[in-house]
């Protein structure tokens, strides 16, 4: 999944690379500082930004607090970046800040968590990710078909 997100972000930036030089994008994730999974994403956006001549800033709530994440999205939008990339870790908590960014004319791309329908309802340009419920359900069906009676889906 992380490779898919990195590729999608790279392609998104590459699509407008001629006009992107000097632009600033902010990626806001829900991950606490202790979540090392996001290091792949941090490295990918840094490399994509360097390659395309754009600034890409990674921001997150240090403890994973979603109210803090909402404030980070608001602060990011107030800085008027050329785009915001964000997770939808909790639709109800993040709905307002994301919609305000869109109303300011800031393009938003939703990644990783949430659903395509939620992203659309918030005004995001696109959703790149795998809805957790659908992924878990699909894994359960495959396990059932394979005769597995107990497993842990992470």
Regions found by a protein language model. Name each.
Residues 2-14:
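Bacterial N-terminal signal peptides
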Residues 9, 18-154:
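A residue-level marker of the well-folded mature domains of exported/periplasmic proteins
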């Amino acid at each position: 999944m992380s490779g898919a997100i990195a590729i999608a972000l790279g392609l998104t930036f590459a699509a407008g690379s001629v006009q992107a030089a000097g632009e600033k994008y902010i990626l806001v994730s829900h991950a606490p500082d202790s979540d090392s999974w996001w290091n792949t994403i941090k490295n990918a956006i840094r490399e994509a930004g360097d390659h395309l001549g754009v600034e890409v800033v990674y921001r997150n709530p240090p403890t994973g607090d979603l109210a803090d994440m909402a404030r980070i999205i608001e602060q990011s939008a107030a800085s008027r970046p050329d785009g915001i990339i964000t997770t939808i870790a909790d639709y109800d908590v993040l709905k307002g800040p994301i919609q305000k960014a869109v109303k300011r004319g800031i393009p938003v791309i939703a990644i990783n968590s949430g659903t395509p329908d939620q992203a659309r309802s918030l005004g995001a340009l696109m959703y790149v990710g795998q809805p957790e419920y659908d992924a878990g359900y699909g894994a359960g069906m495959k396990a059932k078909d394979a005769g597995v009676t107990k497993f842990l889906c992470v």
